[in-house]
């Protein structure tokens, strides 16, 4: 089933795939990584002025990695803001997705966490570095094929 935004994107020749609606009736769209930044700018101009959250997950062992964006259109006098969910999939071998930091600043730490936990590189992010794990950590702890080390270095807090 194609939603209003999906139909609008088709009308304007913007490539995407409709993933239907979630249990709350929020439209979910799949966007290719190479198209994501330009479509993000279009959504911002269209009125999706708030990036509520960004997260990432490992779709399947040896499979794709996904970056998920929850956008909200906040307007004066509107009790129920419009919401939209975007999924961008990247290959496990070279997971690269354009950063939308310059569109929505609220994605800063969220993209960094996705990088730190899953190894998705967000191109043009101004401070893409580990945020939870030490810089010396090897691997991406939330990937399904991650092998946890059998030792941990315990450091004293001072």
Swiss-Prot record:
Similarity annotation: Belongs to the complex I 30 kDa subunit family.
EC numbers, comma separated: 7.1.1.-
Superkingdom of origin organism: Eukaryota
Organism: Solanum bulbocastanum
Reaction(s) catalysed by this chain's protein: a plastoquinone + NADH + (n+1) H(+)(in) = a plastoquinol + NAD(+) + n H(+)(out); a plastoquinone + NADPH + (n+1) H(+)(in) = a plastoquinol + NADP(+) + n H(+)(out)
Record-level GO BP terms: photosynthesis, light reaction
Protein role: NDH shuttles electrons from NAD(P)H:plastoquinone, via FMN and iron-sulfur (Fe-S) centers, to quinones in the photosynthetic chain and possibly in a chloroplast respiratory chain. The immediate electron acceptor for the enzyme in this species is believed to be plastoquinone. Couples the redox reaction to proton translocation, and thus conserves the redox energy in a proton gradient.
Location(s), subcellular: Plastid, Chloroplast thylakoid membrane
Membrane topology according to the record: Peripheral membrane protein
Main location: plastid
Subunit details: NDH is composed of at least 16 different subunits, 5 of which are encoded in the nucleus.
GO annotation, cellular component aspect: chloroplast thylakoid membrane
GO MF term (any one): quinone binding
PROSITE patterns per the UniProt record, alphabetical: COMPLEX1_30K
Pfam families found in the cross-reference section: Complex1_30kDa (PF00329)
UniProt name for this protein: NAD(P)H-quinone oxidoreductase subunit J, chloroplastic
Entry keyword set: Chloroplast, Membrane, NAD, NADP, Plastid, Plastoquinone, Quinone, Thylakoid, Translocase, Transport
Gene for this chain: ndhJ
């Amino acid at each position: 089933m194609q939603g209003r935004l999906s139909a609008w994107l088709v009308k304007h020749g913007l490539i995407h795939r409709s993933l239907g609606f979630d249990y709350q009736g929020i439209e979910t769209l799949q966007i290719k990584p190479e198209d994501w930044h330009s479509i993000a700018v279009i959504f911002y101009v269209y009125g999706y002025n708030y990036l509520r959250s960004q997260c990432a997950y490992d779709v399947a062992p040896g499979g794709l990695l996904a970056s998920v964006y929850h956008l909200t259109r906040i307007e004066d006098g509107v009790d129920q803001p419009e919401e939209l969910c975007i999924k961008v999939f990247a290959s496990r071998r070279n997971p690269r997705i354009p950063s939308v930091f310059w569109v929505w600043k609220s994605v800063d730490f969220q993209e960094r966490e996705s990088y730190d936990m899953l190894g998705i590189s967000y191109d043009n992010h101004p401070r893409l570095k580990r945020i939870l794990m030490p810089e010396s950590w090897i691997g991406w702890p939330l990937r399904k094929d991650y092998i946890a080390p059998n030792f941990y270095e315990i450091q004293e807090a001072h």
